Amino acid sequence: MGDFNVALTDRDVWDPAAFVDSTHVTPAERQAMQVMLDWGLLDVQARPGKGEVPFTYWDYRAGMMHKNLGMRIDYVLATRSVHVVDAWVDREARKGKGASDHAPVVVDVTL
């Protein structure tokens, strides 16, 4: 789990055209991330029926978070044996004074 700094698909950035020739979206970065998924790890935030997966990162400049102009570059990957009850992005933690530019991804599991 953690800050992979890769937007796996164009849906994981607020405007794909704004990130052409930029970090976080290069074919090499996306391929490296895809290798982990091909090994059998699952992106626990992107579960069937869950709907859109929220962004986890917003630049501090120009009020990007308030406009929801962000990226999903933080992931929790797990094997199928982990039963995920829920997963969400804690946007409130990101709003705190001195907070990181990344919001925590919270995952509730049963073992």
Locate predicted features.
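Metal-dependent phosphoester-hydrolase catalytic domains
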Residues: 9-111
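Active-site metal-binding loops of divalent metal-dependent hydrolases
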Residues: 4
